[in-house]
Structures are given as C-alpha cells and as structure tokens.
Amino acid sequence: MKRTKIVATLGPASLKPGVLRKLLFEGVNVFRINFSHGSPEENRKTILSVKKLLTETKKHASILADLQGPKLRIGTMKPNTKVLPGDNVVFTNVSCVGDKKKVFMTYSSFPNDVKIGETILLNDGKLLMKVISSNLKDEVVAKVIQGGLLESNKGVNLPNTRVSLPCLTPKDLGDLNVALEEEVDWVGLSFVRHKKDILELRKILNKKNSGAGILAKIEKPEAVSDIDAILTEADAVMVARGDLGVEVPLESVPLIQKMIISKAIQKAKPVIVATQMMESMIDSLSPSRAEVNDVSCAVIDGADAVMLSAETSVGKYPVEVVKTMSKIVTASESSSTTRIKGRKPESGDDRFLSNAICYQAAKTANLVGANSICALTYSG
C-alpha cells in the first residue's frame, strides 16, 4: 500500500463515463476541482459526482476545491498579435481589444502598483517586458525585452511588484460558498503571500462552521519568505511550481521545494508537490525519465502527496498516468530512505522526551518490519 497520496485534477478527460471510477481504483486519494475553470454550478455537479461515486464504492477519497485567486490576465487580443524586442506596449485598465500597441489588463490598480524598472511576464514567462512609465491612473508603458505572440486572456506575473489585490476575490467568495455548501474536505488558497491571507479564509470557514482544511499554495516570492508563519497557520501547503517557476528564477525552484518539504515535515503539516510532474503523459502513454525521477525524488524527500493537473483533466490517458504514478510512488517508498522522514530530536526541543520516544519507535518498527505502531492516550 502506498503512503504518498495522489491528487488528480478533474476535467473533461476524467469526467467521461467510467473514467472517474477507474481513477479511484487505480490509486487517486484526492480529487481536485479547479475553480479557475467552469461555472460554480458545473463545479458543484462535479463535486456531487465524486461524492456519489464514493458512496457507491464505499471507498475513501478527499475533495479539494482549488480557488482561482487573484490571477492577473490580459484581455481579448486581435489574432496573431506579435511584439518584438524594443517595441513599446501600453497596458491599460480601460477595456479594449488589444493589439501590438495597446493591451487591456484586467488588474485595475496596475498603474498605481507597478514601478519603473519592474518586470512584466506574460504567458508563463514566455514574454518579458520592463516598465518604463506609468501615469498612475489608467496606463503603463512597457518595453519588450523578449517578444512573442500576445494571445487573449493569457496570465500575467509581476515578480517584483507588491500587488494590492486581496487574496480572495469576489469570484473566489462565490466559488467558496458552493464548495462549503457541498462540504468539501479541503480549500486551496491560491497566490498566498502572508499568513494574514490564511487567517482571512479561516475566519470565513469558522463563521460557516466548516471543517474544511486550508491548503496554502506557495507560488509567490512573498510566500517563500513568510513560509514559517504560513506553515503555522495553514493545515497543509502545496509547492505550486507553475507560477512559482515564473515568479522566482527557475534554478531556485528545486531548492525551494526541498526547503518547504523539510519545514513542513518539522511542523507535521502535509505538503503536496505539484505542476508538470508527468506532463508528457498528456499526449504520451509513457513518462519521460526526468519525470519519473521528479516524482521519485519528491517521494524520497518526504512529500505527502504528488499532484496531476492537465495530465488527468484534459490529457489523453488519465487512467494510465495515475497507474504509472502509483507504480513510481510504490517503488520509491520501498527505499529505506523514505521510511523515517522526521529529523532526529535535539535535547533543546520543547517536546524532546515525547519526540525522542516517537522517533525511536519509528526506527524500531522499521527495523523489525512492523505493520503499524499503536499509541495509547488519555484524551484521544
């Protein structure tokens, strides 16, 4: 039995008749509903489909409602709009159909928040621009450093900018109501920057008497800097490598991933590693060797779960990718290096005696091949 959980994102590919059931039986432990896509009622229907399946099969799996968060995007563009290095582009918060001269930005406070010299990244970092001026009202002028196609509704990242948008947008609050009405197990909070973002969501959950856990998605540099406080307040964290890899230098992502996993283990908080884990299996029946290694390393480092995104939501082989990931996880867990994830207790720890007993119990269980450890308590 694998201990590392598999999170599968639901979408058109996995919601085909019979596929959802196969995913469950092949090893999915958490079904993720991405509220960035679909209407609230469509997502409610998906949640109900999962619940019906779990009732029928008498199997256990969690449901994660992943909120979109303050994702920045450009508006509609004219077809085949291409910008070249050296071009100047005007970003406006006044709605328009964009061209190579002017682009609509959905973020209304953009002219007030950005500063001269800051970076604008578009389409997952494929296009790079630098701010050269702002009228502090409705327009920002940027110079193209790395050009390419400007396509409609593509995402925007501002790695140097302190964005004034709230962590929970009006859309998120509407989606959250649906998720809580259907009693999901987890709520994913996107683009977390500081612990106060988690406290804001916690206040809403408490007000609605919800027992849902908060999954803080680490995808902003500010969140990496405040990781200790975030781990204290959140119920679990996700290393969301997609936007994180755009917001910070790519070469930093593996080190940040290892650091977050290590800190999560120390604080006994579940940690998920996500994004492009088995990306090639969107179109291929087998993963690349690098992807196999990526999943395995996450397991060996101590990740509690590994996540599939487009692989199961829109990929050609959703069942096969879960089956393959499950095999990789099981094989990786057979290594002795994955048995005991916690660090050795130090005499200066506040709970040194309890920690030392638990640590040695785990080592002994591993040595003798025990199937389980029984802990007796007074209070439960």
Q: Which residues make up each language-model segment?
A:
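Non-catalytic helical/linker scaffolds that mediate oligomerization, partner binding
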Residues: 1-380
